[in-house]
């Protein structure tokens, strides 16, 4: 007959075994913990090209010849390459639809978002019966099976198409025209508000993005040009995401060298305030690495 101590021990061991088995089948996000321990090995991918099927190797995707641009599904086989290199996190460039009006090039910039809560049809394979969202979920699940966490890029601005649909979301200049940030002519500056008055319409736009990426199983977000939103805006959004997933990682594109807004009409939030708002880290200005031999700081 088992003593009560042995019985408790047996039940405890069974409980631990069951918990381990469940963890083996259900992905548990641990990205913030990994990142803060400096254990994340992050690799950036552009899904639109990552798995592209250029059969004749001419550098051009000929759809008429059965070739296919990069999609969620044809990217999956290449995840094995990343796992073999011990990559444990991928930063996926934006998966939102690309604006067509005033687009740059034939495909348009991935950062010219025409919607923040739907998936870019360019990344969806028409060779599968799965829906766009189901294909995205499958990609994330396959990454997780290989021990790879997934960060999704959050565009900073809206496309001209989105401005035409919802002009109230955008900053306007003195003449009432939407503001072009920096020299990014295919996008317009979103009006996220100020530290004392967050624009709830833009907040809800971004909240919809958070809901979408969490619903496909992603583990974090990289915020493009995070400096042009108020810290209060980010804090509310980050806090919201962590009510759904406490381990949800937030990375800001920012830098100690960034000291000016992208437009006279834009907000500027320095990197230290972004960290106070809840970002786990920041990075930017990698183009300055080439100056390391001559730099003094």
Residue ranges and their predicted role:
Residues 98-115, 156-183, 264-274:
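Aromatic- and acidic-residue-enriched segments that line the glycan-binding/catalytic groove
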Residues 8-16:
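Bacterial N-terminal signal peptides
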Residues 91-104, 153-163, 224-230, 254-257:
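Short, solvent-exposed turn/loop segments enriched in Gly/Ser/Thr/Pro and often Arg
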Residues 24-149, 157:
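N-terminal structural segment of carbohydrate-active enzymes
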Residues 1-8:
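Bacterial N-terminal signal peptides that target proteins for export
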Residues 162-218, 226-227:
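Active-site-adjacent "subsite" loops/lids of carbohydrate-active enzymes
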């Amino acid at each position: 007959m088992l003593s009560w101590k042995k019985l408790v021990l047996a039940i405890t061991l069974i409980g631990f075994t069951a918990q381990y088995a469940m963890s083996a089948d259900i992905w548990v996000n641990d990205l913030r913990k990994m990142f803060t321990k400096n254990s994340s090995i992050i690799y950036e991918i552009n899904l639109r090209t990552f798995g592209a099927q250029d059969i004749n190797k001419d550098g051009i995707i000929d759809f008429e010849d059965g070739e296919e641009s990069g999609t969620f599904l044809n990217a999956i086989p290449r995840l094995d390459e990343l796992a073999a290199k011990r990559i444990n996190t991928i930063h996926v460039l934006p998966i939102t639809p690309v604006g067509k009006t005033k687009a740059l090039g034939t495909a348009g910039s991935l950062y010219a978002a025409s919607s923040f809560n739907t998936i870019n049809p360019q990344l969806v394979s028409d060779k599968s019966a799965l829906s766009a969202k189901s294909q995205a979920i499958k990609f994330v699940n396959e990454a997780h099976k290989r021990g790879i966490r997934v960060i999704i890029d959050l565009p900073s601005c809206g496309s001209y198409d989105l401005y035409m649909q919802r002009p109230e979301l955008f900053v306007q200049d003195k003449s009432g025209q939407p503001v072009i940030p920096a020299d990014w002519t295919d996008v317009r500056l979103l009006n996220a508000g100020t530290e004392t008055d967050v624009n709830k319409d833009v907040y809800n736009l971004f909240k919809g993005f958070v809901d979408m990426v969490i619903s496909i199983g992603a583990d974090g977000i990289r915020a493009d040009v995070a400096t042009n939103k108020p810290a209060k805006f980010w804090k509310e959004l980050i806090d919201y995401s962590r009510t759904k997933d406490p381990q949800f990682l937030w990375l800001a594109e920012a830098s100690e060298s960034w000291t000016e807004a992208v437009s006279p009409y834009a907000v500027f939030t320095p990197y230290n305030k972004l960290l106070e708002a809840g970002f786990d880290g920041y990075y930017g200005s990698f183009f300055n690495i080439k100056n390391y031999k001559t730099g003094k700081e």
